[in-house]
A protein has these predicted regions:
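Serine-esterase "nucleophile elbow" of acetyl-processing enzymes
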Residues: 1-82, 89, 269
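Alpha-helical cap/lid subdomain in secreted, periplasmic
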Residues: 82-286
Length: 286
């Protein structure tokens, strides 16, 4: 049994606890619905307690540091992880830590912005007469739409400059290619996971990397499936389980609160599967 003192989770809003922004005072309707459906729960009304990492902490007693952030993707995962390694004390005790990753799909591109001295995230998708669509092969610079910010729920720091937004988005449209972006996302994930393996870092994956152009096992002989959490519908498919098993907030509130993130019970189930995989792979938690 490995002696572990910390678990670090990385990912998108699905790891942060999306939909449970109890501090989003700019959205009174959301707060009203959260209070209606979840105020009876005997837990603090904070996002962290409704997320699966928060429930993981409650069930295991192990400190869980949640680096997930709404809107961001794999580039944020890599930045956050490497930032931790800059601390020599942290690195020297890395064998006592477990890292859990929720990789994102396409649709997220990160830039550093000098004018705010921070990273900004561009979320993009296709748009036609029927609305939004997510078939990346059909995207072109004429049918892309986007959201652009450095914090989706802290409305004080959302980028309000349309000129700045349009500059980045116009550059993105001119430099974007579905094949090239799929290739880059795949290669970056292969490199990152290979790095984890080289350092013998304890890690698990709840949502598998985006691989459309490469067979993961061709590049990493051990096979990624050994580290993927096994959910009801298959390995490394946390988001798929939430949708297929009707575990979203929308499902949990009978459609009254429309939100595709995991509900409280959905996150509870996710944390149970994560604990099961932790025990099976590392024998860390009893």
């Amino acid at each position: 049994m490995i002696d572990i003192n910390e678990i670090h989770t990385f990912g998108t809003s699905h790891t942060q606890g999306g939909g449970f922004e109890w501090n989003d005072t700019n959205n009174p309707k959301k707060l009203e619905l959260l209070d209606k459906f979840y105020s009876h729960l005997d837990i603090p009304k904070k996002q962290e307690f409704f997320s699966w990492p928060g429930q993981l902490h409650q069930k295991t007693g192990v400190e869980v540091i949640n680096h997930g952030q709404s809107g961001f993707g794999d580039e944020k995962i890599y930045r956050s992880f490497y930032k931790l390694l800059e601390d020599k004390n942290f690195y020297n005790s890395i064998n006592k830590k477990l890292f859990i990753f929720e990789f994102a799909e396409m649709g997220r591109k990160e830039y550093f912005c000098n004018s705010i001295n921070d990273y900004i995230i561009l979320n993009y998708w296709g748009k036609n007469e029927q609305g939004h669509f997510h078939d990346y092969e059909k995207y072109d610079e004429n049918n892309l739409d986007f959201a652009f910010t450095n914090d989706f729920y802290n409305h004080n720091v959302i980028l309000n400059s349309n000129e700045l937004k349009n500059k980045y988005f116009n550059f993105f449209k001119k430099s974007w290619s579905p094949h090239i972006y799929q290739q880059k996302i795949s290669m970056d994930a292969i490199g990152f996971i290979s790095f984890l393996e080289t350092l013998s870092i304890n890690y698990l994956i709840v949502n598998s990397p985006f691989f459309r152009l490469y067979d993961m096992n061709t590049y990493i002989s051990w096979g990624i499936t050994e580290k993927e959490v096994e959910f009801r519908n298959g390995k490394g498919d946390m988001l798929g389980m939430v949708t297929k098993e009707k575990l979203t907030i929308s499902d949990e509130t009978n459609g009254e609160y429309q939100d595709g993130h995991a509900g409280y019970e959905g996150n509870n189930i996710i944390s149970d599967y994560v604990i099961k995989k932790i025990n099976k792979t590392y024998n860390l938690i009893k």
